[in-house]
């Protein structure tokens, strides 16, 4: 566990009767570990379920809800994963999901992909008991914030074609996984001459639209956010 400056999960939406934006639930933590994001998400969803009453999580969909995670800290590796049960709960309430972070002095982590791209979206599944296969992969050269949802859709589209039935349900028993690789820069290693705002490089925030979450749930897939700071070393 590592102490952080700010870490919170917020569930917000729009009142269907008044049109007023409201905060439904808010949970905070003073520390970071790889499981804390999933824990905070489920805590705010528990509070949201209480708010919705008898209608349960499904009742939150009328509020057009968004679940945001905010993180500000230093020297923290901000990788995390969401299991299929958490994805299912996000799907039930029709939520969009966003992760906004500011990490100074990100620990040095090598990407486990052979890539020079800043973002890569990858969908994999266990087609054989001992073999994880890349079903679809899309690279994004630069950290263009919030564009990754287009690439996620394209990855799912390729996965539909893989199954030949325009469905993701064929992956439900294949331990499917959607992984987002994201490069983190620091002031020290940023080499982009056109860079005028360091926040642009060292805040590779992202979002998952409700349609992406619905597709994750259809495939019974987990989600993994895998940040890194450097490419694989050249192999001699």
Give the role of each language-model region.
Residues 1-219, 226, 232-236:
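Acidic (Asp/Glu-rich) sequence patches and key acidic residues
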């Amino acid at each position: 566990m590592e102490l952080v400056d700010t870490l919170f999960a917020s569930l917000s939406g729009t009142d269907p009767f008044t049109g007023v934006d409201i905060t439904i639930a808010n949970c905070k933590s003073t520390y970071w570990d790889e499981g804390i994001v999933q824990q905070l998400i489920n805590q705010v969803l528990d509070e949201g379920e209480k708010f919705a009453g008898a209608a349960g999580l499904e009742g939150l969909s009328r509020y057009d809800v968004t679940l945001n995670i905010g993180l500000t800290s230093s020297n923290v590796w901000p990788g995390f994963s969401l299991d299929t049960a958490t994805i299912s709960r996000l799907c039930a309430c029709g939520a969009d999901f966003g992760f906004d972070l500011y990490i100074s002095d990100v620990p040095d982590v090598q990407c486990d992909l052979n890539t020079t791209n800043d973002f890569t979206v990858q969908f994999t599944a266990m087609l054989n008991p001992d073999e994880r296969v890349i079903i679809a992969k899309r690279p994004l050269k630069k950290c263009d914030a919030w564009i990754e949802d287009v690439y996620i859709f394209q990855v799912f589209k390729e996965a539909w074609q893989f199954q030949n039935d325009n469905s993701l349900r064929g992956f439900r028993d294949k331990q499917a996984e959607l992984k987002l690789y994201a490069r983190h820069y620091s002031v020290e290693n940023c080499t982009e001459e056109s860079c005028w705002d360091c926040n642009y490089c060292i805040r590779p925030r992202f979002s998952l639209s409700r349609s992406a979450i619905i597709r994750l749930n259809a495939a019974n897939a987990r989600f993994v956010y895998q940040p890194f700071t450097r490419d694989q070393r050249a192999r001699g």
